């Protein structure tokens, strides 16, 4: 392998990490409140609202059901509107984020369902407001499961970023197609694959470690 190929491998790896981490950040910032509301408006919860809960769940389920490659195509006009182009790593972050938001929202709602059922009553008996119940009881109690959800989201996005790269999104997927396939450099495809596997394994290991650290049960 030439120094130029190694340089491209390094750059493509950084692009993949950039897409994965930024899209995960958007998923947390937007998906967490949506998932929280989906849980809080559920039956028997502090903001119980059947209509709002149904609407939120429909939005989340529709968002999760659209295959990423189709979402990528559907969002081309929106991506161009937001970043001015449909090519490159920054452009790829738009569909990656949109796909990850409902995914993480569902993981958040499911994480909150793991909270002991008597916690709300105990908090209310001590005079806690709804805001205090959420910030001092629900979220701290669900941190380990939320960390697992963040890890799962990042791992999924690393895989999606390879698909985005295959259609001009940059990263290791684009490297594998451009050099590994079109220029018949088979070893480039293998290197890109191995690096993606290593990123996923390291992300999972780090996520598991953090979840264990925050789990005080």
Curated annotation (Swiss-Prot):
GO terms for biological process: D-methionine transmembrane transport. Its main location: membrane. It is found in: Cell inner membrane. GO terms for cellular component: plasma membrane. The chain crosses the membrane at residues 20-40, 58-78, 81-101, 143-163, 184-204. Gene3D superfamilies: MetI-like. The keyword Lipid biosynthesis does not apply. Coiled coil: none annotated. It comes from the Bacteria. Part of the binding-protein-dependent transport system for D-methionine. Probably responsible for the translocation of the substrate across the membrane. This is Probable D-methionine transport system permease protein MetI. The lineage of its organism: Bacteria, Pseudomonadati, Pseudomonadota, Gammaproteobacteria, Pasteurellales. The gene is metI.
